[in-house]
Amino acid sequence: MGSNKGILRAVLSLVVDDGAYQSEQARVALHEAQGLSVELQVLYAANDPLTQSEQLLKIIQGPKEDRPDVMLLEPVGTALPHVAKAATKADIGWVLLNRVADYLPELRTASTAPVFAVTDDQQEIGRIQGLQMKALLPDGGSLLYLQGPSVEAAQLRTQGMMATKPDNVSLRMLRGKWTEQSGFDATASSLRLRSTVDAQLDGVFAQNDLMAQGARRAFIELAPDRVNSMVFAGVDGLPFAGQAWVRDGRLAATIQMPTTAEIGLRLAVKALRTGTQPAEVTTVAAKSFPDVSAIKPLRKAAHV
């Protein structure tokens, strides 16, 4: 599994090029690559699983001398089992970010290249959101809940949230695509429905900070009389985005979700240079920002 080359080559495949968390994944990976003397190519799949698959297969099936030593990817849809198999057959390492897959044990047994996953605990992220709801709405209430696309991460976050959400908090489910615009569009469509116009809503929880911001913008533009009496919350919690938005009052809470790309790259490089196989799954911990105990309840009397 070890490489004889002084400089290793890696490919990082990310979901979109305009998301705060995805941009931070690229930034930290490029910084880590520089320190590790790794040539890193970053690809973006434009939120399209077919594009992601085609981009990676094109590299795998290209000239041997141009192939990377390892591929790291945050899957758009499925964890691309056929691409993973093709990569490991070509002796290319395979690292899943923020996802685990049933095929990992089999590929690890058959491959001489490193095969593993580095992931945030997606269910725990959801559980934290449920606790934030309880802190913000101790007497219950009604929220719009903006889920991401129908992929595992979004599903697990929803499952975790439902496990800790208070029974007296009701949800109306909406669907976005992780982008601010998709959060705006989903919320704006809902606000055009009479059922939403007439509803007593206390806020919007979204599965990432950008969708939460998009939802807030929709209320500012379409229901400005309601926005100041509502709470908005998301996930990612980057210092320059979610955390900053909590500090300036645009969000009531977020969840700090550590980046995983630099960890995956570091573990892969160590594996390639030492001939060892990392643990099958490395999990990093998320946390509420601010801490759940410090979240101030929404003042219901503020409703107009």
Question: What kind of feature is each model-predicted range?
Answer:
Residues 52, 115-142, 183-187, 237-242, ...:
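Hydrophobic alpha-helical segments within soluble ligand-binding/sensing domains
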Residues 6, 164-165, 256-304:
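Hinge/cleft segment of the Venus flytrap/periplasmic-binding protein
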Residues 1-9, 64, 87-90, 304:
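Short, low-complexity disordered leader/linker segments with a strong preference
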Residues 33-50, 142-145, 162-184, 228:
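Short beta-strand elements in bilobed, periplasmic/extracellular small-molecule ligand-binding domains
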Residues 20-36, 125-129, 152-169, 182-186, ...:
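Short, solvent-exposed amphipathic alpha-helices that sit
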Residues 4-28, 32, 41-57, 75-78, ...:
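Extracytoplasmic "Venus flytrap"
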Residues 83-124, 239-247:
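Flexible loop/hinge segments that line or gate small-molecule binding clefts
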Residues 70, 74-92, 176-244:
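Hydrophobic alpha-helical
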